[in-house]
Amino acid sequence: MSLNVLFVASEAVPLAKTGGLGDMVGACAGALQRAGLHVTVMLPGYPAAQAQLRDARVACALPDLPGGPARVLLGAMPDTGVPVLLLDAPALFDRPGNPYLDACGEPYADNALRFAAFSHAAAHVAGGVPDLPAFDIVQAHDWHAALVPLLVKRAGRPVKTVLTVHNLAFQGNFPPRIAQDLGLPPEAVREAGFFGQFSFLKAGLMWADRITTVSRTYAREILTDAFGYGMQDVLRARRHDLVAILNGIDNAVWNPSKDAYLSRPFFAGNLSGKHAAKLQLQTLLRLPKDAHAPLLALGSRLTHQKMADVALQALPQMLEAHPDLQVAVLGCGERRYESAMAALAERHPRRMAAVIGYTERNAHMLHAGADLLLHGSRFEPCGLTPLYAMRYGTVPVASRVGGLVDTIADRGSPEAALRGATGFLFDGETPEAMAGAVARALRVFVQPRAWRVLQYNGMTTDFGWSQPASEYLALYATLAPRATPMPHLQHWPMRTLARPASPPDTAPVGKPARRRRTTALSTTARAHPVARAAGREKIRA
């Protein structure tokens, strides 16, 4: 038989998305399905998800869940056909707002109950439901599904579990007194205690058979006091079970040569369509149409993690120091940062525009039309936004943390001479460091041939899902060795992006970037000791 894998997550594109978690779950499931695995995604039954579910029918009833009876619906993704299970529990998931926050931006008061019920349902489904066989492996994503490994083991199911940590800062910590309403054994509540609270995430870290995270550098960082968010001791104890697999992006969705949101397609060998996209973006944002003005984009959540506070101090410095600079902000997050960004744009109406909110159309137009992407972050598990930007020839200026270290080759580093620079990294959390990195980038921007090499290197680097999918396959094989892999997996071709022989108009400017893909298998001179086996990297102390 082939492997049967159940993804359990709070979001997955296209059914539900608030950020990178949704992108990863949907795209990774599709990639594994193309690799020949039987992958099923289980999500809460949000109304929008149910409306998009294809060929929906009732798979089973669950009368005894915490929070009341519910049904499990079985259907398929509308785009990839990946099987989907939705927990149909209207009292828990039929609400205004997003999956986690109410219409006022506050966490739902019963989030513990909502996601405990979801985890109980997933643990039941793991044993098999009508029309679906029992699963070999259950992969839970972030704290919302982190109770699943505990509940699977408590039920005695012969299923291996993986917990993928997308962001260690989000832990699902709640008062232990509510645990009795969540259907959890008292001893588990005690063992997963976390500074006087019960932690969903800690429970997952303790009971999962393997723990994965989404970049090599972040996997090492979370073992330290600086980035461990209180979980570092648990992670150090499980370090031999910690695996780093870099996230990919969906090259079919993020494809400038076939992007329906753009007026003209473009590719690495011909950027005329990108010039058109810049004018299109300037028109949308009511900025002066100027093909020569450097256009800096900020397209991330407006939060403390993403250094929105630092950007608010650095942007006025940049606008003053660089009279031609234009700034485009697309994002949402904490209300104070949203208001401050909007106010800053109002003070510079012909230099800066801020669109508070997020749509896929605007995100595609931003990455296609901008020249540079500013991506500050105090910590960054992976960092998908710069990968989207590089795919569209937009050069990232980013913090030197987490997955950004693994995916952006800093033009100022010795390593860039070997693997081809793709952007600019800065250290620290000060406005001066951020503004200085942008200034460094702008000095290269006025050198068209050198800038073109940066764009070319980024656009021709393959950050698709082929390599990460192969690493997940290797991980699953170690967990379920008795499951027979499908024969064609050994010969599954790695997808690569088409690229011209050399960057147009840049042949004299040094050597074109060597083809690379920075993954969990990459090593650098600064890398900690690692053990690599079967296409994956285990993080050791």
UniProtKB/Swiss-Prot annotation:
Gene Ontology biological process terms from the UniProt entry: glycogen biosynthetic process
Pathway(s) per entry: Glycan biosynthesis; glycogen biosynthesis
In terms of CDD domains, this protein maps to: GT5_Glycogen_synthase_DULL1-like
**Keyword Glycosyltransferase: yes or no?**
yes
Instruction: Please name the GO terms that the record assigns under molecular function.
Output: alpha-1,4-glucan glucosyltransferase (ADP-glucose donor) activity; alpha-1,4-glucan glucosyltransferase (UDP-glucose donor) activity
Reaction(s) the record says it catalyses: [(1->4)-alpha-D-glucosyl](n) + ADP-alpha-D-glucose = [(1->4)-alpha-D-glucosyl](n+1) + ADP + H(+)
For the ligand (ADP-alpha-D-glucose), the binding residues are K17
Chain positions covered by the region annotation Disordered: 497-541
Gene3D superfamilies in alphabetical order: Glycogen Phosphorylase B
Give the Enzyme Commission number. 2.4.1.21
User: Which keywords annotate this record?
Assistant: Glycogen biosynthesis, Glycosyltransferase, Plasmid, Transferase
Q: Which Pfam families match?
A: Glyco_transf_5 (PF08323), Glycos_transf_1 (PF00534)
State the protein's purpose.
Synthesizes alpha-1,4-glucan chains using ADP-glucose.
- HAMAP family referenced in this protein's UniProt entry, alphabetically: Glycogen_synth (MF_00484)
The family this protein is said to belong to: Belongs to the glycosyltransferase 1 family. Bacterial/plant glycogen synthase subfamily.
| Name of the protein in question | Glycogen synthase
Which organism encodes this protein?
Ralstonia nicotianae (strain ATCC BAA-1114 / GMI1000)
The protein's gene is named glgA
